[in-house]
Design a protein with these regions (language model features):
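Short, solvent-exposed loop/turn segments at secondary-structure boundaries
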Residues: 62, 262-263
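Short amphipathic alpha-helical segments embedded in low-complexity Lys/Glu-rich regions
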Residues: 18-31, 227-236, 265
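Short, conserved loop/turn and helix-capping segments at secondary-structure boundaries
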Residues: 75, 264-265
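Short, charged, low-complexity patches
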Residues: 206, 263-264
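Glycine-rich phosphate/pyrophosphate-binding beta-alpha loops
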Residues: 252-260
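Conserved N-proximal alpha/beta basic substrate-recognition cap immediately N-terminal to
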Residues: 1-60, 65-67, 74-87
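Catalytic core of tubulin tyrosine ligase-like
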Residues: 46, 50-233, 242-247, 252
């Protein structure tokens, strides 16, 4: 998805599309939907150059083909990556013999908090056709909250209970509440944002989320095999930052449909 979004932006630029408009800092106005992201091992050397340009940034590493928060960790120093390379025997510096690919994204260190906790949105999307693109959004998605209050302290970088919203992670914590599962419906979250941020700001935020979903699917429209007898269902994970800007974090091709609380049913 990341590579296709980047390619789609370049295609729009070549077409002089207004969707590819940039601001005075060179950032996309309408297509700035994903954090700065690299795919390892292929992008490792490029990432090292960028890391040295932003030595104080935090990055989040995720294995491409795992689920439930497994294998995710934060990186603030190159030595962490090099040590991890040696321990896991994954030679990023070349494409020989690595076990699995990883996605490395710039960590959004200032998320919007509710009750001091970080959260993200899980939105279910049904695509019945890619050509033409026909998309349906399920109204009853939900917000998932971290089980512990958020802290940007460097000493808390390894505490996944404040950084990850995955239920499988949260259940390992004694504070996990199995009645509500640390979840709100999206309708409840939107109502909360209307009350705390204003109705106009909340509506703008959710309009931008809809745009993220549409742009993401347009980006892969040309590479997904279209079969009128089939459909695709995706789980979009979106994080809202402190400025009420939504960011695409993940697109899950096989989202879990298991239920743990009434909100899921």
């Amino acid at each position: 998805m990341v590579k296709n979004i980047k390619r789609y932006r370049k295609d729009l630029e070549r077409e002089n599309s207004p969707l590819a408009e940039k601001d005075e800092l060179g950032r996309y106005v309408n297509m700035d939907i994903i954090p700065q992201t690299y795919i390892f091992p292929g992008d490792y050397n490029i990432f090292v150059e960028e890391f040295r340009r932003q030595p104080n940034a935090t990055w989040i590493m995720k294995p491409s083909h795992r689920a439930q928060g497994q294998g995710i960790f934060l990186v603030t120093k190159l030595t962490q990556l090099k040590r991890w390379q040696n321990e896991s025997k994954v030679p990023f510096s070349n494409n020989q013999g690595y076990k699995e690919s990883y996605v490395c994204s710039k960590y959004l260190e200032e998320p919007l908090l509710v009750g001091g906790r970080k959260f993200d949105l899980r939105i279910y999307v049904l695509v019945t056709s890619f050509r033409p693109l026909k998309v349906y959004l399920y109204d009853l998605g939900f917000a998932r909250f971290c089980v512990e209050k958020y802290s940007n302290d460097t000493n808390e970088r390894e505490n996944m209970f404040i950084h990850l919203t995955n239920v499988a992670i949260a259940k390992q914590n004694a504070q996990y509440n199995d009645k509500h599962g640390g979840k709100w419906t999206i309708q409840n979250l939107k109502f909360y944002l209307e009350q705390t941020q204003g109705k106009g700001a909340a509506e703008k935020c959710f309009d931008e989320i809809n745009n993220i979903i549409w742009v993401s699917l347009k980006a892969v429209q040309g590479v997904v095999i279209n079969d009128k007898h089939c459909f695709e269902m995706y789980g979009f994970d979106v994080l809202i930052d402190a400025n009420l800007k939504p960011w695409l974090i993940e697109v899950n091709a096989s989202p879990s449909l298991s239920t743990t609380t009434e909100i899921d049913r």
